[in-house]
A protein has these predicted regions:
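C-terminal, charged and often intrinsically disordered regions of DNA end-processing helicases
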Residues: 1-81
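Hydrophobic (often cysteine-bearing) scaffold residues that line and stabilize catalytic clefts
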Residues: 80, 84, 88, 134-137, ...
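Anion-coordinating catalytic cores for phosphoryl-, nucleotidyl-, and glycosidic chemistry
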Residues: 55-56, 171-174, 185, 287-290
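A non-catalytic, helix-rich entry segment at domain boundaries
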Residues: 90-167
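Conserved phosphate/pyrophosphate-binding and hydrolysis machinery centered on Walker-type P-loop NTPases
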Residues: 81, 131, 282
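Short, hydrophobic/amphipathic alpha-helical patches that form generic packing surfaces
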Residues: 64-68, 86-97, 225
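Metal-dependent nuclease catalytic regions and adjoining charged, substrate-binding loops involved
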Residues: 1-15, 19, 212-217, 227-315
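Mg2+/Mn2+-dependent nuclease catalytic core
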Residues: 163-265
């Protein structure tokens, strides 16, 4: 198979072709035991669902974390950025899953059709747009699809070797469902080793546009934890892939990686339980005040956060 230099670099250096690590057979059970033993006696909001957003909120400010737990945020509504992101991932799904090669424009159009059919909120947003606004979003999806195809080997042609899966929702239920840890993977590559099941053969990739942020590494570690709990074996590597430059930040998964992620889940469960008992949240001002539902009444809120975020977004 003929590949360009960027495609070959992604295949050889990120996806990799070398030996994969083998993990102990009891790894998933030890992770589960660590979490369940730490939180079993807590008064949890039941069920307590934790994903990357809530864990990141806790790392910023307990007040923001509590507001999300309490469902205080207004109902989600699509905007240009969220709609573009949804269509971008759907277009990549179309490209990878198609029987025949598709050009980026066709993939983008199919992504719209399928998303309108499957997601009511997106359909309402899309129907309310003018034709020029729809065209503008579609062209951004086309651009991102071109960047993806120029960065990765042709996954459609490598389905047998890499078993690509896109937009894969996963969750791990703990304590009989009282605690649920979940995530959605942009791209999962690799097939299980049937002869040696505890060999880690998968890589989980989060597709990104824009700049890198510190929380991306923690997000990926959480994905590794949920995969380990769900499938019994973790991925060998997790990565954030930046489409504009064809670059990535990756981390090879080790047991320490997984137990670190498990400890973040434990910390969040303990925080949720103690605030449920009446403890006041620890308040930390920052850029997140711009989107916190409690900003107008919070004594620690940064009054200039919204203005700064708006300036940074327009820069």
């Amino acid at each position: 198979m003929q590949l360009t230099d960027p495609q070959r670099r992604t295949l050889q250096q990120l996806i990799g072709t070398g030996d994969r690590p083998v993990f102990p057979a009891d790894l998933a059970q030890r992770l589960r035991d660590r979490i369940e033993e730490a939180v079993r006696g807590l008064d949890l909001p039941e069920p307590l669902w934790l994903g990357k957003e809530k864990l990141n909120d806790l790392g910023r400010c307990e007040g923001t974390f509590l507001s999300r737990l309490s469902g205080e945020a207004p109902p989600f509504e699509h905007g240009r950025a969220s709609a573009t992101g949804v269509l971008q991932h759907r277009a990549i799904e179309v490209v990878v899953g198609a029987r025949e090669p598709l050009d980026p424009h066709t993939a983008a159009q199919l992504a719209v059709t399928r998303t309108v059919d499957k997601e009511e909120r997106f359909a309402e947003f899309w129907q309310g747009l003018s034709e020029p606004d729809r065209d503008d979003i579609l062209m951004e999806v086309v651009r991102r699809t071109i960047l993806f195809e120029g960065s990765f080997p042709p996954l459609r042609e490598l389905r047998r070797e890499l078993s690509p899966a896109t937009e894969l929702p996963i969750r791990a239920e703990l304590l009989g469902g009282a605690l649920v840890v979940s995530g959605k993977l942009d791209l999962l590559l690799g097939s299980p080793d049937r002869l040696e099941p505890m060999r880690a053969t998968r890589i989980a990739i989060d597709l990104k546009t824009g700049s890198a942020y510190p929380q991306y590494a923690e997000d990926n570690r959480l994905y590794a934890l949920v995969l380990a709990l769900r499938f019994g074996v973790p991925p060998f590597r997790v990565a954030s892939f930046f489409l504009e430059g064809g670059t990535w930040q990756s981390e090879d998964v080790a047991e320490d990686t997984l137990f670190h992620a498990a400890d973040r889940v434990i910390e969040a469960a303990r925080s949720a339980a103690s605030m449920r008992r009446g403890r006041d949240p620890s308040l930390t001002p920052g850029p997140w005040c711009a989107w916190c539902p409690r900003a107008q009444v919070c004594p620690a809120a940064d009054p200039d956060a919204s203005a700064r975020v708006a300036v940074e977004a327009s820069a």
